[in-house]
Amino acid sequence: MSGFVVWFTGLSGAGKSTLAAMLSAELRARSVHVEVLDGDEVRTNLSKGLGFSKEDRDTNIRRIGYVAKLIARSGACAMTAAISPYKAIRDEQRAQIPHFVEVFCSCEIPVLAERDAKGLYKKALAGEIKNFTGIDDPYEAPESPEVVVDTGKETKEESLAKILAKLEELGYVPRRGAAVAVSGAAAAGAAAGGARGLIAPHGGELVNRWVEGAAKASLAERAKGLPVIELDERTESDVEMIAIGAFSPLRGFMNSKDYLRVVREMRLESGLPWSMPITLAVSEQAAEGLRVGSEAALRARDGRIVAVIELSDKWRPNKELEAQEVFRTTETKHPGVAYLMSTGPVYLGGEIRVLERPVDSAFPAYDRSPATTRAYFAEKGWRRIVGFQTRNPIHRAHEFITKTALEICDGLMIHPLVGATKSDDIPADVRMRCYEELIAKYYVKDRVLLSIYPAAMRYAGPREAIFHALARKNYGCSHFIVGRDHAGVGSYYGTYDAQEIFNAFSPGELGITTLNFENAFYSTVVGAMATAKTAPGDASTQVNLSGTKVRELLQRGELPPPEFSRPEVARILIESMRSSS
């Protein structure tokens, strides 16, 4: 591959040197020769004697650019990590270097001042230091850099993933089996030359919309004077899922272009596959005072302001079209359609910045963000991870398909949905006790991670199966189990529609591999769990109870056959039904 230059620019303390070091370690692990021209090191050696006048700074950058060009000409990668505050001199280097990648490390002054251990920003702001870049000396931000990383809001690993994705897209570096791991441990593994990369997040970047430190305090204060939008249980969970990156690449609620293409084609406006509209609906009255280009505060049901939305769009959707395309029905008996029709007639689109969790986790021991699960998988050395979505207790059929999937993967993530579900679904706390008991007694614990998925259930069947798969990709799963009637309700979808819908995309577009399973049962012929593919015999040889039949048994305090459910799980369910009756 041709040589190239990665030109980091940004204010002092914005993370240029840190990211250059991380990127160089990752590229060396991919057998790319790298030379890093760090700003302080260059000033000590290459540019010794130069001052801080504009002329001297330009000379410094020209020297760095010349050396970087020579390194790239030799076929290597040169990285520069100087502030390089002036746009004209940076553009001059771009014009002279054939393969030039500008990375703008953006960060707000209050955040930089807070993280500045030397206290230079505070002194500059107080007037004690003169000619300090970004305070009383100008810094001209790039207008069209190849990559922008917001180091005040993103983790180092997330910023690194964005840079790598662009370098891979440009063809400057080889793709690595999957992608860079999004954790410090994984980065260390890469630096050591290990092949421990995980699947890339959807869109190449693990989004992080949390606001922290001084920026958080500033935004929270500003939010007090903004118009308020009330969140409900669904949109509260959506805010959290966007914030933690589970809905990557979404950075907020969809605008009308993304929304319409998702509804009609299951793609974002960029062309990236995405199957579910993620929208913020409001009443006519609430929408009336809001204008595109302004901000609004998002208020949780308990009265707290938890986020701010930067409004980029406002429109009236065709909800009948949305219902038919997404849920395949307009009947309000369908819980997804019922919710859709109950919400306001106006949709608001825009990126969000999140101050606080809308709802505290009911299961903190199992509450892991995508960045956290990725770090866990990397530390375990897992590369092939299969995700299993469930909103029900795990019975023998589920146990069978998860263990079958685990045979071809390094690890299994049991990822129960604990957000809003139907009123007749089994409560999340009861289900969690079932999962704990089952994993403790019937799984190899070192190969299984139990972690909650705090999203709302939408009951969109086939479309939601794709949505669930893409979310698990963001959590680091390379594989995803799709069983019979995934995310279905009633008789609105065919038994295997949720498997067949994946054929709408060409191989590789989704970036995650589905493992499709037929209905599993206990076969009296083979004396084990099986499917119609592996066990002969008619229906009389299959122990396969309906959900209604199981509920009747449990309500009477009777254990289902052990071929259907582990007795430990059944006892927990019986106890729950007795206590709730």
Swiss-Prot record:
Annotated GO CC locations: cytoplasm
InterPro entries linked: APS_kinase, ATP-Sase_PUA-like_dom, P-loop_NTPase, PUA-like_sf, Rossmann-like_a/b/a_fold, SO4_adenylyltransferase_pro, Sulf_AdTrans/APS_kinase, Sulfurylase_cat_dom
Pathway assignment: Sulfur metabolism; hydrogen sulfide biosynthesis; sulfite from sulfate: step 1/3; Sulfur metabolism; hydrogen sulfide biosynthesis; sulfite from sulfate: step 2/3
Stretches the record annotates as Sulfate adenylyltransferase: 201-581
Region (Adenylsulfate kinase): 1-200
EC number of the protein: 2.7.1.25, 2.7.7.4
One Pfam family, short name: PUA_2
Molecular function GO labels: adenylylsulfate kinase activity; ATP binding; sulfate adenylyltransferase (ATP) activity
Reaction equations catalysed: sulfate + ATP + H(+) = adenosine 5'-phosphosulfate + diphosphate; adenosine 5'-phosphosulfate + ATP = 3'-phosphoadenylyl sulfate + ADP + H(+)
Enzyme active site: S84
Keywords on record: ATP-binding, Kinase, Multifunctional enzyme, Nucleotide-binding, Nucleotidyltransferase, Phosphoprotein, Transferase
Disulfide bonds: none
Residues engaged in binding ATP: G10, L11, S12, G13, A14, G15, K16, S17
Domain of life: Bacteria
CDD domains in alphabetical order: APSK (cd02027), ATPS (cd00517)
GO BP field: hydrogen sulfide biosynthetic process; sulfate assimilation via adenylyl sulfate reduction; sulfate assimilation, phosphoadenylyl sulfate reduction by phosphoadenylyl-sulfate reductase (thioredoxin)
Record family assignment: In the N-terminal section; belongs to the APS kinase family.
Protein's UniProt name: Probable bifunctional SAT/APS kinase 2
Organism listed in the record: Sorangium cellulosum (strain So ce56) (Polyangium cellulosum (strain So ce56))
